[in-house]
């Protein structure tokens, strides 16, 4: 006689997720000497994250954060301050914001004396795109985000790409320098000394 055990939800192609917070867009603010300035809105053009042509342009793709129970201990779970899960297209909830890399701290010093960071896998072009939402552990690493729980009304939530619990948070948006046929593109990054 044996005990029948069900496969974990993510192995059956399911994640336990539900929408939290408001539908919104990806936007950044620059911060310098105690002042915020320079809002920049982002949209997905042909599934690639790019800045809108006008800094405060109206993105076509609205996004919804989905809090998900982590199907593996490699991923962070929700805390009192942060939700963790997937960032999905509001009107296409099978499409998820997906990075091509994750960030790790290096032994090197950053440009301004703080810690240095690099993306992995080494040599992979860093991009943020829209892909089918996944339940595979490897792809979840590229689709696992954290979002702050706003403590006040009308306060925007902060968004980070988290990946595995051991990975560094990518809390900034950087632009690819090289021009390609598809455009420059933008991605979640971990900038030194920010």
Predicted regions and their residues:
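Extracellular glycan-recognition/adhesion modules and their associated mucin-like linkers
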Residues: 7-107, 118-124, 131-194
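Secretory targeting and sorting signals
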Residues: 1-7
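Intrinsically disordered, low-complexity Ser/Thr- and acidic-rich flexible linkers and loops
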Residues: 111-115
């Amino acid at each position: 006689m044996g005990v029948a055990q069900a496969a974990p939800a993510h192995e059956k192609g399911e994640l336990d997720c539900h929408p939290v917070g408001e539908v919104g867009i990806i936007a950044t603010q620059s911060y310098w000497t105690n002042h915020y300035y320079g809002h920049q809105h982002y949209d997905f053009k042909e599934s690639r994250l790019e800045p809108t042509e006008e800094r405060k342009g109206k993105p076509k793709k609205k996004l919804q954060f989905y809090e998900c129970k982590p199907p593996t201990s490699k991923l962070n779970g929700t805390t009192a301050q942060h939700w963790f899960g997937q960032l999905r297209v509001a009107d296409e909830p099978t499409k998820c914001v997906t990075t091509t890399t994750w960030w790790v701290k290096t032994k090197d010093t950053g440009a301004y004396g703080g810690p240095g960071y690099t993306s992995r896998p080494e040599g992979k072009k860093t991009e943020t795109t829209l892909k089918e939402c996944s339940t595979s552990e490897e792809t979840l690493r590229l689709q696992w985000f954290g979002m702050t729980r706003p403590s006040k009304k009308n306060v925007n939530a902060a968004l980070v790409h988290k990946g595995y619990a051991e990975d560094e948070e990518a809390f900034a948006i950087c632009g690819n320098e090289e021009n390609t046929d598809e455009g420059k593109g933008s991605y979640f990054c971990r900038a030194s000394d920010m």
